[in-house]
Amino acid sequence: MRTRCNVIEGLCILVIGLICALASPAGAQAPTAGPVQAWGLPPLPAGVGPVEKFADVSGTPQGQFLEGGSFDTQGNLWFVAIGSGWISHLTPEGKLVPVVNCNPPPEFGQTCEPQGSRWFEGKLYLTSRHRGILIYDPQTKELKTLVYTWRNQLFKGPNDLDFDAEGNLFFTDPWGTGPGPNMSDQTGAVYQYARDGMLRKVMDSGAFPNGIAVSPDDTLLAVGDFRAGRLWYGTFQNGPNMGCPQCPKDPSHSTFAGVKAGTFMPGNGGPDGIHYDVKGNLWVASPPLGGVLEINPRGVVLGFVPIPNDDGATTNFAFGGPDNQYIYFEGAISGTFWRFKAPYPGLIGPGGVRLPAQP
């Protein structure tokens, strides 16, 4: 009886196997995942062109740890060197043009250490770890300080900056890179220097707020927290504050209806410089990962573009080039610049002009 049962069971298994084989298309294989890069990073984003070298400033004072990145109206890529204090630009052909050094005279004993850069209304705005927010006027060649203290205390080390559509300036101030008030307060902050000249602290938490960008629809402030390895999104309070009916409306973008935690970086990659494209995708530079990530408006990582020379410090980048659709990103340690064509144009165009958002 047991032998007969075994025969019947075997026939059943054989029949089921034949049915499954007939139901499958000829040559069909089990689905496989797409190629995965080092550290489990996603593949290249769709629509990305090949990466090519744009310039090499290694071995020069202007190439000592690259940061910043912004295009003027003539197509020049401006950048800074943290290690030497130089503010320079590359011509559209990739030729290096040193412009000005922001280090004070040696007798003052303090370096500048510039970080972020952004053009706005014909002037270059910069963050400096030790000198606060600087403005360079290309017409007069003057470099001056806009603001360097909050309530009579030095900033902790201003890092990056962006403007909203109304012309309000936002900048991050992480603890640990600049003079800093004291060791007991190791949190960072985000400030707004409003169009009317008022300085406000709009965020006072976060381990190390770094990159910062205002969304294409001017409703969100994205902040990259380098130490926490994630992004934060603050929704601007434009209309009535439902939690405070007696409070006035806030068209100046100085308060938030809410702040929420966003995407964690894959591979423990802390976010550095961040920029939106016109579709609302957020592009994020990550020094630990050595490249840039594309994240869609829902917070999903769409892909990763590595820097070709394995430079472990992709600090920042800028949209520019033909149709403002090329990303120029930096190898901070190697002193090299690379570029590739992105799927969509960047939100910030030449001279810091915000381009129209696309649905």
Where are these regions (language model features)?
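Beta-propeller domains
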Residues: W78-C102
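A short loop-to-beta-strand structural motif that recurs across blades of beta-propeller domains
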Residues: W86-S88, G132-L134, G188-Y191, R230-W232, ...
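Beta-propeller fold detector
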Residues: E52-A55, V97-N103, K144-Y148, K201-D204, ...
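Short loop/turn segments immediately following the C-termini of beta-strands
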Residues: I82, R129, P174-G176, F226, ...
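Short loop/turn segments immediately following beta-strands, especially the blade-tip
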Residues: G234-P248, K341-I348
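Beta-rich, blade/repeat-based domains predominating
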Residues: S58-N76, P104-H130, R151-L169, W175, ...
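Bacterial N-terminal signal peptides
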Residues: G10-A21
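Blade/loop signatures of beta-propeller domains
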Residues: Q29-E52
